[in-house]
């Protein structure tokens, strides 16, 4: 872990060390959605409460090692992806009987399935975008995106191909949306 962080640019590591609390997310779209969900809940952005939302890619565990040593309050917002068992194994040092007081792993334990395919590959219903559609509806998201998708599967395809644009439109939207429970759990 020390070698990893020595090679890292350092800014996100410094952000984790200096913040009062952190919410770790995988990418830009997750960061925008968490920021907006927090804003819709509290009427202000997380940074105004000294909570830094940090995009860490797939390096969650390395950041959690630092948070654990510093006893830094941290939530992780992560996709379940294809396997709940694999996710729970990955975070076994931080959940269940191993849960740390300062670390909160937030994910949807309900596995969704469907028959949608994109370019001949099965669609993953257990990422943020399909969970956003599930928490809302096609009409709401079509209105925010300025689209007119006639089926949930068409909207799934659009959202998967335009993750950051969709998240940015949600972030900037005048109206609020519903958020998956695991996203809200990261800051409530």
Residue ranges and their predicted role:
Residues 6-24, 28-188:
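Acidic, Mg2+-coordinating catalytic modules of nucleic-acid enzymes
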